[in-house]
């Protein structure tokens, strides 16, 4: 427990620091959107690219982990569709709820995996992201637009333009080509990657909106409980059924125990979803994850 807390508390300290820096408008209100963009389009893709470019793609863990990811996401998606039919949610509300249950904070996830498992864990996590990011994006867009319909192009275009997915694909191709990262490229990418996670966590804190917590308390509460407790339990069940080893099980459960992504608010607003509910879900889940994530990982590892 002590080792786990030592690995996780600095990550949440950065999130809290980001919130208070934004609250004080330091260095300026305009800084944070720009910082988020440079991280999303340059620094974080550099981390994913370098992780996959040097990862052992012949690792027998990869097909096991891929199967576990898709099975867990598929089961959660089916449960959401059943709940939508029973509750009669509108597309805008269903889209926010879906993202609250399925999306995950990649910055926090990779930072936690890096603290717990180092480069080996980061390589596995990057490969998980290559599957999870496009799958969850398709589910999110469909959920937000289900009532008015959306073309295949409308579903796939955001995925094809996503810098995280492009970085994963490019890194895997470089790896398979055998070219490696010559001429100091590895050092350049390492420097960019080193800046990504701290800046990303500060931006997560800066994006929190506590004022949105005064709205739909029951919806915020049960959505957070499902995401932070029930979904990790589902992932653990899948890992047990498939017989995943300890490290793979921990990484799988960790990613399914993460709070939802701050970028879910942008997508919800762009596609006409319930952005107020989405903002509240993001904020409450991120705050509660400071307690739930150590709890889940402690129970998982005995």
Give residue ranges: language-model regions:
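Alpha-helical transmembrane segments of multi-pass small-molecule/ion transporters
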Residues: 1-302
């Amino acid at each position: 427990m002590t080792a786990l807390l030592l690995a996780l508390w600095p990550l949440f300290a950065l999130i809290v620091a980001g919130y208070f820096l934004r609250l004080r408008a330091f260095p300026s209100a305009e800084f944070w959107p720009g910082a988020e963009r440079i991280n999303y389009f340059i620094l974080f893709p550099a981390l994913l690219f370098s992780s996959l470019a040097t990862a052992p793609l012949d690792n027998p863990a990869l097909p096991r982990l891929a199967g576990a990811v898709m099975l867990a996401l598929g089961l959660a998606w089916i449960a959401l569709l059943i709940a939508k039919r029973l509750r009669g949610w509108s597309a805008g509300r269903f889209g926010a709820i879906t993202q609250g249950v399925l999306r995950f904070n990649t910055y926090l996830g990779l930072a936690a995996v890096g603290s717990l498992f180092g480069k080996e864990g980061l390589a596995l996590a990057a490969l998980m992201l290559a599957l999870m990011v496009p799958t969850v994006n398709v589910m999110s867009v469909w959920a937000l637009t289900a009532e008015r319909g959306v073309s295949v192009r409308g579903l796939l275009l955001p995925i094809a333009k996503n810098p995280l997915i492009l970085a994963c694909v490019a890194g895997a191709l470089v790896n398979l080509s055998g070219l490696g990262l010559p001429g100091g490229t590895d050092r350049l990418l390492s420097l960019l990657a080193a800046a990504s996670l701290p800046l990303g966590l500060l931006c997560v804190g800066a994006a929190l909106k506590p004022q949105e917590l005064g709205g739909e308390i029951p919806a915020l509460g049960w959505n957070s409980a499902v995401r932070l407790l029930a979904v990790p339990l589902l992932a653990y069940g899948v890992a047990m059924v498939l017989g995943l080893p300890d490290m793979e099980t921990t990484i799988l459960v960790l990613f399914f125990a993460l709070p939802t992504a701050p970028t879910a608010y942008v997508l919800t607003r762009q596609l006409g979803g319930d952005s107020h509910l989405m903002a509240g879900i993001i904020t409450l889940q991120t705050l509660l994850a400071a307690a739930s994530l150590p709890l889940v990982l402690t129970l998982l590892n005995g």
